[in-house]
Amino acid sequence: MDVPQNKQIIELSWQNMRPELFIGDSGVTLKTGESIDIVLSEHRYCVGYVRFKARERTPCQDKATIPSGKEGQCNFCKQQDASFTAKTGYGLSRQAGDLLSADHAVYLAYFADDVIKVGVALWERREVRVLEQGAIACLFIGRGNGTMARNLERKIHTQVGLTEWVRLETKLKNLQKLPTQIHIQLALEGIFDRIRSITPSQIMFDTPDFHYLLPSYSLGPEVAESDILLVQSVPESTRISGTIVGVMGSTLLITAADAHVYAVGGRYLSGFHCVDLSSTFKHQLAGLELKKIPANRQRSLFDI
């Protein structure tokens, strides 16, 4: 994988249904089986922000430094960004108004361990949004403006009891013991029927739209066979080197020289520059703060 040198890492994102590490002004496609070798800079700077319907990113006016382990934006730029308004409903009044009047999808997303969450996304970003979250599958259940979609999401959360947030550890847990696609689809459709009976809405579809997303992540066999070491923070001057074995949502999965599978959140890379590989580095993946997500090697009903 060819990585531009002396360019800032902006984000790990999904473009045309494929994961890319956006560096400088171009995207580098992350392909399973390819090697990755980057050295992060000694300093980390805010990546700026993108407003709703804007085509270009606005640089941070303060060129603010960002500590490792945090999001790649300073507080000012974070609150200017369309994603902040989309998540919270707050922010610039005009941007909030534009977002709330735009079409949104209401969806159910399925994760490992039969965890199902409810969420909303801009209609034109609906498939990208569930890929960013690392959902195994999703069911689009309704369409309406931002206000109507959020109201339905809130009712489903409070009246049906679905979560609106899933921990990364849960998303990476038991990936080798997932049930069949049919089982997942039936589980989502069962929740959809329950929602219609408890809290019907005029923006809900008569027939929901199911998408099976697992193949998009191109998970290598190592992910199913090994414990996953979740990187808790990426400090300055870290060398990230290994073979890509998948991208789960916004998390890069790598096998390093020690044969372990490491999960590196894209948000920890955002803001660093990729410096020359000959540069001195202080840290490697094996020396970072890690949390083990054990592989479930027990047989399940679906193995019989």
Question: Can you say where each PLM-predicted feature lies in the sequence?
Answer:
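Non-catalytic accessory segments flanking enzymatic or RNA/DNA-binding domains
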Residues: M1-I304
